[in-house]
Amino acid sequence: MTTSPLANPTATRELLEEFGLATKHRLGQNFLIDNHVIERICELAELAGDERVLEVGPGCGTLTLALLQEAACVTSIEADPELEPVLDAHAADYANFRFIMDDALRVTPEQIEQAAGGEPTVFVANLPYNVAATIILQFFQTMPALKRAVVMVQKEVADRIAAVPGNKTYGGYTAKLGLYAQVTGRFEVPPRCFMPAPHVDSAVVRIDRVDGVVPEGLDREFVARVIDAAFAQRRKTIRNSMSANGFAKDVLDAAFEACGIAPTTRAETLDVAAFVCLARELSHDA
């Protein structure tokens, strides 16, 4: 059983007091204080001891200390400069821990690879909820060696990530993430597992990279552009939405026919394979 010495209110409070810190809601900081949740996160991550783990938003290092027991190395990205002394103290105790002080959305894959001593293979994090969805998609897009992610997010974000066609939460984000990966696990985390308790429910999701969704020679960025155009005017038919966002109607009609898609369909009913088919047909005229 993998646990963290900081995963209880007393230990977290004492550490914050030792370094003169208070929680900062502006950065979305709610510290995890439940070892049962940490154990389940580690089980879902299936770390075998040889992975380079990437973490975003380590906070005071509660999850980090658990990951360090199971990974070859852990590289964390933290935006709050006041937490640097805490992470420095952890780095002094663990030779396999490295960290970058910066906004995760600004750090380049090259910076991460340099800090980690190679490309990260697993992403495990209790993510800042305000940027969680963006970070997940960006990391899968820019880090090809990333095999899977196990991330704590707001329940509504987890619903978007795991949504299926026809579901009201299924949208352009879900379809674009589906070009790279799919959800393979999930569990809910109540507010009482954090300090301070957030005013929202949380969930942990496991997302595994899937190869071969987009065929060789078809640009994923173009597929994403097709998805964005299809969802741009969600209440309209896919033909009207896409024609208002850069695609000619006659070209669209030919692509719809080739893919067996009715022009009166709405984007939220189509799966990722349908968008890939559309993009393939439309790429001939791009």
Where do the PLM segments sit?
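Catalytic cores of RNA-modifying enzymes
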Residues: 1-228, 257, 268, 277-284
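C-terminal lobe and adjacent flexible extensions of AdoMet/dcAdoMet transferase-like proteins
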Residues: 209, 227-286
